[in-house]
Amino acid sequence: MEPVLELEDVARSFPRGIVALRQVSLTVGAGEFVAVMGATGSGKSTLLHCAAGLDRPSSGSVRLAGREISRMRERPLTRWRRDRVGFVFQSYNLLSELTVRQNLALPGRLGGPRRRDIDEVLAAVGLGGTGRRPVGELSGGQRQRVAIARALVTGPSVIFADEPTGALDPTTGGQILGLLRRAVDRDGVTVLMVTHDPAAAAWSDRLVLLRAGTVATDAATPDASTIADRLHAVSTAVAR
């Protein structure tokens, strides 16, 4: 399996002696769905942000889609990432006053997706015919579908998802995870997802558990009950 994402000895520290990541190494292959879990403060979101180029590691290297990104300047990185990376966040990051179609067109204003591509991806996520509706009129589940569509419309190699179901009920959350799973299985997209929910993590192929900024577990994903037990064990070990 060809690597799409490679982190090597990545560390991230902040002022006042806060260390979020400690020499983390992680390789994610093409078409792989990886869930990242851990106790509060374990470094989950920092790992995702460093992997996506949204934050810079204090040391170590990050290769994304074959390119070393940890030392790229911000503007070239943003341009390079536009057609290769999609993002899905718990807060949706959509503009409520704009229509669904306008939100999907935003990531590619400098030569972005065609209208036909937008309509096709909206149909694929179950939002066919909603392109002219303002996002502010949609339910939470529909907004997250728009966010998934926006992530997919440029044909990315990787989707980074930070708690994509955190604000949704279990049924709607399952539908959103099904869309991510389909992107992996049908389109070969790589997904790196941070979640606190064992049921959400169970949709992945691989589970990475963080403990105090280090990788405690990296293995094939078990069932939700076993994930919950492992997460509890890691969290308890940190509390001691």
Regions found by a protein language model. Give the residues of each.
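The feature captures the beta-strand-to-loop junction immediately N-terminal to the Walker
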Residues: M37-A39
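Helix-to-loop junction immediately C-terminal to a conserved catalytic motif
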Residues: A52
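ABC ATPase NBD coupling module
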Residues: I69-V85, S225-A228
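Short coil-to-helix segment of the ABC ATPase nucleotide-binding domain corresponding to the Q-loop/switch region
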Residues: L98-A105
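ABC ATPase C-loop
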Residues: L127, G131, A151-L152
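Conserved ABC ATPase signature
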Residues: P134-L138, Q142-Q144
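A short, proline-enriched helix->beta-strand linker immediately N-terminal to the Walker B motif
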Residues: V153-S157
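Catalytic Walker B motif of ABC-type/P-loop ATPase nucleotide-binding domains
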Residues: I159-D162
